Amino acid sequence: MVIMSEFSAVPTGTGQGQQKPLRVGFYDVERTLGKGNFAVVKLARHRVTKTQVAIKIIDKTRLDSSNLEKIYREVQLMKLLNHPNIIKLYQVMETKDMLYIVTEFAKNGEMFDYLTSNGHLSENEARKKFWQILSAVEYCHNHHIVHRDLKTENLLLDGNMDIKLADFGFGNFYKPGEPLSTWCGSPPYAAPEVFEGKEYEGPQLDIWSLGVVLYVLVCGSLPFDGPNLPTLRQRVLEGRFRIPFFMSQDCETLIRRMLVVDPAKRITIAQIRQHRWMQADPTLLQQDDPAFSMQGYTSNLGDYNEQVLGIMQALGIDRQRTVESLQNSSYNHFAAIYYLLLERLREHRSTQPSSRATPAPARQPQLRNSDLSSLEVPQEILPCDPFRPSLLCPQPQALAQSVLQAEIDCDLHSSLQPLFFPLDTNCSGVFRHRSISPSSLLDTAISEEARQGPSLEEEQEVQEPLPGSTGRRHTLAEVSTHFSPLNPPCIIVSSSAAVSPSEGTSSDSCLPFSASEGPAGLGGGLATPGLLGTSSPVRLASPFLGSQSATPVLQSQAGLGATVLPPVSFQEGRRASDTSLTQGLKAFRQQLRKNARTKGFLGLNKIKGLARQVCQSSIRGSRGGMSTFHTPAPSSGLQGCTASSREGRSLLEEVLHQQRLLQLQHHSAVSSDYQQAPQLSPVPYVLTPCDGLLVSGIPLLPTPLLQPGMSPVASAAQLLDAHLHISAGPVALPTGPLPQCLTRLSPSCDPAGLPQGDCEMEDLTSGQRGTFVLVQ
């Protein structure tokens, strides 16, 4: 992390021991806000208007041609965007090696950080924020600009907690009917067509991201996430996500209409504005009128604020040069002072609501005087004697190496030195007996010295787990791979897993509900057991379940909270589509934390599918995990399968193959406890498609069915043909007497009383237990 002191030491020989502030042009640098690989963001204050700004300092020497073009395009887009909910561009300064972008400073930071610290928003708060986001995105689309990286990290909050849309690095121009083909964005917020590598319409891409953003605002978690990018890609393509119980039906409907897999069937911005959830608060409809807020910002069209121009002229700034800068969109010092003063004027009006009823000619002189009294213009800009422009921005002097190491990191020593220099706070000696020309006052004083230096280091962020509460509706789950010899794995294979959902749908995948679910149900088979956080008696906090972080970029694990609380019953307040999870399956484990920050990527279409990734993991499992067990002879055939044959399998075949490997592992682990048990020949028995009982104590398959060298696909196929007889519907059980080795479970059967080594599907209702058969 680059640390730069707010003040710099005075060069030796001055005879003064005080420290002097650093300055970039007309901006006094205060501190570092953040940095990346080739850029650093500084907080600075304009010396004339006393307004805080953010200066993004970019090292052009460390950018290739494509990234440099991206930076210039971002600047070009920001010059065209003048909206109260979009970060305002004030000034652009450029040297041979450096680029300085001065923008509006949002003092309350990112919406992402706000959610990680305070939890999810109420729907009323989320509606207000979403109206502002929608207004900014609609303004961009009306100007044929698509953002393509909408996420909570790019939504900033100003001093009034209003939204400011930022970071147009992936933005671009678009024309209706001409699709785009740059597959970029942040994976959790990216649309399905980006992962598939299809051409897309820009607005439809932003609407999908808007749906994810609204979900995050209301829920405090991501709708689509996964331990890796292939898993995340699969979930996005399926369009399935979970809805918490506290979300209203109208909000759920709006989110589902935005998160539609088929982009042609997604809701439009005009339809979003007319949605019932958006229209629930009439006061927000009256505030959504940017016409008044945009007064004075459309200066390139000749709409100038005469009040601001009068203030600048009173300060000695040439009016004609200011107007020319605004007309040409130069974004130099003249334009920067104009826009900063305009912002100050708006703040002054907002603090005096009664002034709107006063006639404009009567209050205009009062506002001008108040603005002039609060500007605190430095002494060097007052008219005196003529002076050389170099005195306003002298060439940087060489400082001692020890001073540089104590104040400026090695990266900023060379990259920022052309613009940073010690400034004497008492400028009376420099400008004594000299007059100042308004024209030379605002010349861009930037040194054109070349620079060389090492690369910038990345700043490490402090990662903190967030408190949360329980209570969430679960409609999708994964299979837990954590089991013990006494509790062998049960893998549920759904026939719809390998089938893509119908276009234009966004449905849940419901699992059977267990009426006897308790604290042990959700915590038994989790990689990180327990739940995080506490619940508020006033309003529900964000319901985070503690476990491994599902962010595909960082993949960090969550810590346990200070207090482990039992899960809230899912039976209270559930709608007809609400479901919960059976024991042994992973619960909903997404949470929005500081270490879950996502980054934008190019080439999301190059992410491999889930089937290929599962295949590779099965290869590693067969080579590493099986080597610790004394497996029977057929396992050599499983290990000898070539990679090329695995790559051609479908997702269902790979899941069956993994099920077979897990069964063999468990069978080998517990076989030593049953060496004296009689070996019973298997009896063909017809089961329903949902039957998934594992037999521990008898051979899993007859010896003739498992031959050395048999492929796992053929083994799984014979398993289905010989024993399961899976069909489209449930098959009736035989009415004759059952063999002695087979008994039917009674509804009152207690699973805890089973002999060691026996297993069954856990958390089943009484009606479901009657349809399963336990093999003893």
Curated annotation (Swiss-Prot):
GO cellular component: cytoplasm; nucleus
Subcellular location: Cytoplasm; Nucleus
UniProt-listed Enzyme Commission number(s): 2.7.11.1
UBA domain segment(s): 303-343
InterPro entries per record: Kinase-like_dom_sf (IPR011009), Prot_kinase_dom (IPR000719), Protein_kinase_ATP_BS (IPR017441), Ser/Thr_kinase_AS (IPR008271), Ser/Thr_kinase_SIK1/2 (IPR017090), SIK (IPR034672), UBA (IPR015940)
Protein task: Serine/threonine-protein kinase involved in various processes such as cell cycle regulation, gluconeogenesis and lipogenesis regulation, muscle growth and differentiation and tumor suppression. Phosphorylates HDAC4, HDAC5, PPME1, SREBF1, CRTC1/TORC1 and CRTC2/TORC2. Acts as a tumor suppressor and plays a key role in p53/TP53-dependent anoikis, a type of apoptosis triggered by cell detachment: required for phosphorylation of p53/TP53 in response to loss of adhesion and is able to suppress metastasis.
Name of this protein: Serine/threonine-protein kinase SIK1
Organism: Rattus norvegicus (Rat)
Lineage start: Eukaryota, Metazoa, Chordata, Craniata, Vertebrata
